[in-house]
UniProtKB/Swiss-Prot annotation:
It comes from Herpetosiphon aurantiacus (strain ATCC 23779 / DSM 785 / 114-95). The gene is accD. Zn(2+) binds at C29, C32, C48, C51. Binds 1 zinc ion per subunit. This is Acetyl-coenzyme A carboxylase carboxyl transferase subunit beta. The keyword Lipid biosynthesis applies. Coiled coil: none annotated. Pathway: Lipid metabolism; malonyl-CoA biosynthesis; malonyl-CoA from acetyl-CoA: step 1/1. InterPro entries: AcCoA_carboxyl_beta (IPR034733), Acetyl_CoA_COase_Trfase_b_su (IPR000438), ClpP/crotonase-like_dom_sf (IPR029045), COA_CT_N (IPR011762), Znf-ACC (IPR041010).
Length: 298
């Protein structure tokens, strides 16, 4: 009996149930570290239920969040970048990097573009995926956005751009920089047919994108906490040798200084853009006009 109580403890082994828990059950907030069931996290559009941090989502996910079901028709999906400069780097080969990134993300470049609708209201959309080479703007990026704007002008509908970028793609040099002008020129044609450009700035939006077409819009929206600017915070502080305010280059800072029109939570984005599209709809008759005016006063 004495030896019975002195037995060595049995080695601990994890249960069969614990071994079968898949990796994607939990999602961890990148801001506060809160753990949330992945399904609950996805249902909340990847916004943390504790701190309301908006995690980055892909261009495809943005379209699923905003567009009516089965309304999105993609254009120019076959456009692919090429190494037009023969870019040489000791770290990577541009063509190989493009191929590897395409395989990982399932897209040929940063932008996914096409036609869609919100609440039955048609528009053109060009959405950026930051996961593709940091959302960098190259020839394919600019061409797809410009074509989306031109389709909007041809159809007489608004265009929505969702902008997340680190700036121009260094691998394409001047060909990347010229996309800033190309898209901005396309937007002048949209303005001539009196259709709006709605720009949504999401984290992060920097460089040539924020310095060109993303800021040339009739309505500029941003997500809470999105980092927006031209040069990064560290670069500016090193240049001016001063510390910047804690909220510098955030969406809230831009709103406070009149540089954007609204900061909109992701859960309200579809409804907000739907209201803007209705606002810009042209009444087709006097009866429609009266209905529009009455609805506006309700």
């Amino acid at each position: 009996m004495k030896d019975f109580f002195r037995r060595a403890p049995l080695p601990f082994t994890s249960s069969r149930r614990e071994q079968q828990i898949p990796d994607n059950v939990w999602a961890k907030c990148a801001n506060c570290g809160e753990l949330t069931y992945q399904k609950q996290f996805n249902d909340a559009l990847k916004v943390c239920p504790k701190c309301s941090y908006h995690s980055r989502i892909s261009s495809r996910e943005w379209i699923e969040v905003l567009a009516d079901a089965d309304s999105f028709v993609e254009y120019d999906a076959d456009l692919q970048g090429i190494d037009i400069l023969g870019f040489v780097s000791p770290k990577d080969n541009y063509e190989a990097k493009l191929a590897a990134t395409s395989e990982r993300t399932g897209t040929n470049d940063v932008v996914m573009s096409g036609s869609a609708s919100i609440e039955g209201l048609p528009f053109e959309i060009a959405a950026c995926n930051f996961e593709f080479m940091g959302g960098s703007m190259g020839s394919v990026f600019g061409e797809k956005v410009a074509r989306a704007v031109e389709r909007a002008a041809d159809r007489g509908v608004p265009v929505l751009t969702i902008n997340a970028s680190g700036g121009a793609r260094m691998h394409e040099g001047i060909f990347a920089l010229m996309q800033m002008a190309k898209v901005s020129v396309a937007l002048t044609r949209l303005a001539r047919v009196r259709q709006p450009h709605i720009s949504l700035l999401v984290d992060p939006c920097y460089g040539g994108v924020s310095a060109s077409y993303a800021s040339v819009a009739d309505i500029i929206l941003a997500e809470p906490g999105a980092n927006i600017g031209f040069a990064g915070r560290r670069v500016i502080e090193q240049t001016i040798r001063q510390k910047l305010p804690p909220n510098f280059q955030t969406a809230e800072f831009f709103l406070e200084h009149g540089m954007i029109d609204a900061v909109v939570p992701r859960s309200d984005m579809r409804a907000t853009i739907g209201r803007l599209l209705r606002l810009y709809q042209r009444p087709t008759s006097s009866a429609d006009h009266r209905e529009h005016v009455v609805a506006g006063h309700q």
